[in-house]
Amino acid sequence: MLNTAANFTRTRIAPTPSGYLHVGNALSFALTAAIARKTGAKILLRIDDLDQHRVNPEYVQDIFDTLNFLAIPWDEGPRDAEDYKQNWSQLQRMDLYQDALQQLADQREVFTCRCSRSQLQGFSSYPGTCRNRSLPLDTPDTAWRLYTDDREMQLKTLNDAIITTRLPEAMKDFVVKKKDNYPAYQLASIVDDLHFGVDLIVRGDDLYPSTIAQLYLADVLGEDDFKKKTFYHHPLLMEDGDRKLSKSAGSTSIKYLRGQGMTAESVYAEIGKILTTKLPLQRFQDCEALL
């Protein structure tokens, strides 16, 4: 339930240009926009493009095509693909990410890990293979992981509840710098949210562990402002009842549906059917009823 007295400065829509956006993304964007307009928050468009080997110009353009098709507004950020490339790519904020990584190194909060994905297959959480090996931080082809413990954290929700929680086991010693030397999602996301002054973060239930990891990282970095932010985690749209939608599911992409002649109103209506809403959805403002 949305606190009707809530007021925020800024929220964000943060797609990744690694595939065509689908109806699950549309739901997240629409909810973000609905909450923003209800609470007076500006909407920042932030394109998360640090996974460079997966970035495709077609997917970047699809972000703008999808937002415009669905009439999802944004107040800040790139207006088109060229503006994004010239002024808003995360690559232009690398100094900010490097400063945070250097702080973690100076505080001795990170360790070097050379484990490959295949070596970690079958483990539900990081087994600590490299935790005590004291490998130099400048070892080539390695990642940096954060030393984590069992400390408590508090999460503020959209209805003003405070949840006391701990880092999920699956996020133990999570990665903050990848083997390609780019910052990992958890670090880049918190740095960006602090940099842009985002105080309301809307994301799917599947990213709840990431929220806890980011609150943990904020505590390590001494970023108390991040710990004051409000979070809303929304239900996911599921395929076949138990699998979340993915960008590889072409038939649910907005691009595909648009090509089949569906209108924006039809896409919203389809989302409403999947969620079995009492009232039909026709535009992003209608998603306020889902809160």
Where do the protein language model's features map onto the residues?
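Non-catalytic terminal extensions that flank enzyme cores
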Residues: 1-20, 38, 43, 141, ...
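N-terminal Rossmann-like or analogous alpha/beta NTP/dinucleotide-binding catalytic cores
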Residues: 2-125, 206-225, 277
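Proline- and acidic/polar-enriched loop/turn elements at helix boundaries
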Residues: 48, 79, 116-117, 230-233, ...
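Short, Lys/Arg-enriched charge-dense amphipathic segments
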Residues: 64-74, 97-113, 131-145, 249-266
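A short, terminal or domain-edge coil/loop segment
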Residues: 68, 99-109, 163-170, 280-291
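Short, surface-exposed acidic
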Residues: 74-77, 225-231, 265, 278-284
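Low-complexity, flexible helical/coil segments
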Residues: 79-85, 146, 222-227, 239-240, ...
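Active-site cores that bind ATP or allylic diphosphates and position pyrophosphate for catalysis
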Residues: 112-246, 253-258
